[in-house]
Amino acid sequence: MTDIQDVISPKLAVAIANPIFPAVDSLLRSGRHISTEHLDNHAFLMDFQNELDGFYRRYNVELIRAPEGFFYLRPKATTLIARSVLSELEMLVGKVLCYLYLSPERLAQQGIFSTQEVYDELLNLADEGKLLKAVNQRSSGSDLDKQKLAEKVRAAIGRLRRLGMIQTVGEQNSGKFTISESVFRFGAEVRSGDDPLESQARLIRDGEAATPDSLALEKQAQLMENDTKSADEIDEEFDGEQE
């Protein structure tokens, strides 16, 4: 029988025994990003980052600390932890949130934005016709089509809120929120750019909604096509967790 000390280091044992671990573990497994706004959770991950990264690698995921300081789990193609996939519109909304995070308006408005501002900025930066077609291929640009697009944007913002990208301000349904630095999951391409704001705007205009992580996962999925599994089995494994 394997000695437990051969598997778990003393410091990892301390981390797992910490009362905060179950909550942090559940948040990470659900896809949540933990930023500096979450003081206790973030401090816990800072203290035990190396030990917990080794722990999660046994599930074929990595505990990542981004340059901006936030933590999240990045799955490999063979992950044992269920993952969900963002839609193209959700990723595009994420890029708009990153654009707003970089904008001068964030300071002018004390960092508070509204759902309507995200929608308006999306229409300002992206092609409205393409957005409407993404919601309904037969879109004629009617008011009903625009209403459906607005509903999809609100749903995307709600999804990103659950992932820790934004924090609600005031009542739950106020439509007001602050943007976390974790939106840089959608802005990794502009970290080294000369003008991050303009670079992000260009990415949105060009419809480049994929993130580096999503592109890596796509490449890994293509490599897995040579596996002995059938196409149906592959679809079930990699896409079955989509919300």
Swiss-Prot record:
GO terms for biological process: cell division; chromosome condensation; chromosome segregation; DNA replication. One of its GO terms (cellular component) is cytoplasm. Involved in chromosome condensation, segregation and cell cycle progression. May participate in facilitating chromosome segregation by condensation DNA from both sides of a centrally located replisome during cell division. Probably acts via its interaction with MukB and MukF. Residues 223-243 are annotated as: Disordered. Transmembrane segments: none annotated. Residues 233-243 have a biased composition (Acidic residues). Belongs to the MukE family. This is Chromosome partition protein MukE. The gene is mukE. It holds the Pfam family MukE. It is found in: Cytoplasm, Nucleoid. It comes from Haemophilus influenzae (strain ATCC 51907 / DSM 11121 / KW20 / Rd).
